[in-house]
Amino acid sequence: MDSVLNGRQSRQSLDAPSEPILIGLSGPSCSGKNTASTILQDYGFYCIDADAVSRKVFTEHEKEILNLFQAEAEKRGINLKNENGIDKKAFALLVFSDEELLKKHEAFILPIIEEKIWEEIKRAFTEKPERPILLNAPTLHKTSFIKKCLFILYIDAPFILRLIRAKKRDRLPLKNIWLRFSKQKKFFSQYFFLNADTIVVKNFWSSASLKRKLLQEVKKRGF
């Protein structure tokens, strides 16, 4: 934490900032965002996992989500229910197969997720105003947070490496993984067109190399 605070203090006066210091973390599936988040958390950042927030919101609003998509699932012969509630793999297959269904899902769930994340940002800021807050959010470009981030760390990795990681982690057919990846082809261009200060960090096999690159980038910016 001392390294983060000293860097921040070198950039501005010792007075506590008047608003949260937000830094975005994004990138395509299985590029290494969670590893990057852990590295920066160890360095002293407060890290918010938007996926974890999303999963919690999904569970809390399963009934509404089921009502929204049950009819479309039945048309496609997809059973959304299992003994635990909504079958998340079946649900992902449904929404990622149709752009309009994905938009419908995001229109419902993203505002709720944003509200929950803002609550956590406010708590973290109240505890330690000078501490940078890292927002690990794959779809950061679809939220209002992007305009409030000082800069964005965009983690990328070779396609084949991401494919291997996804297959090992999710145990889905390659066709399903390919479909999900295809929906993310324009991720980086979204940040470019939003004029966001985006830093691409390449993540290959070595976590040590990723750590070196990440710390080099944040130190350049005084953290």
Curated annotation (Swiss-Prot):
- Write out the GO MF terms: ATP binding; dephospho-CoA kinase activity
Enzymatic class: transferase
Could you confirm whether the keyword Nucleotide-binding appears in this record?
yes
The reaction(s) annotated as catalysed by this protein in its Swiss-Prot or TrEMBL entry are:
3'-dephospho-CoA + ATP = ADP + CoA + H(+)
Q: List the subcellular locations.
A: Cytoplasm
Q: In which pathway does it act?
A: Cofactor biosynthesis; coenzyme A biosynthesis; CoA from (R)-pantothenate: step 5/5
What would be one Gene Ontology cellular-component term for the protein?
cytoplasm
Q: Which UniProt keywords apply?
A: ATP-binding, Coenzyme A biosynthesis, Cytoplasm, Kinase, Nucleotide-binding, Transferase
Q: Which Gene3D superfamilies match?
A: P-loop containing nucleotide triphosphate hydrolases (3.40.50.300)
What is the superkingdom listed in this entry's lineage? Bacteria
Indicate the principal place this protein occupies in or around the cell: cytoplasm
Matching entries from HAMAP family are given as: Dephospho_CoA_kinase
Report the protein name in the record: Dephospho-CoA kinase
Biological source species = Treponema denticola (strain ATCC 35405 / DSM 14222 / CIP 103919 / JCM 8153 / KCTC 15104)
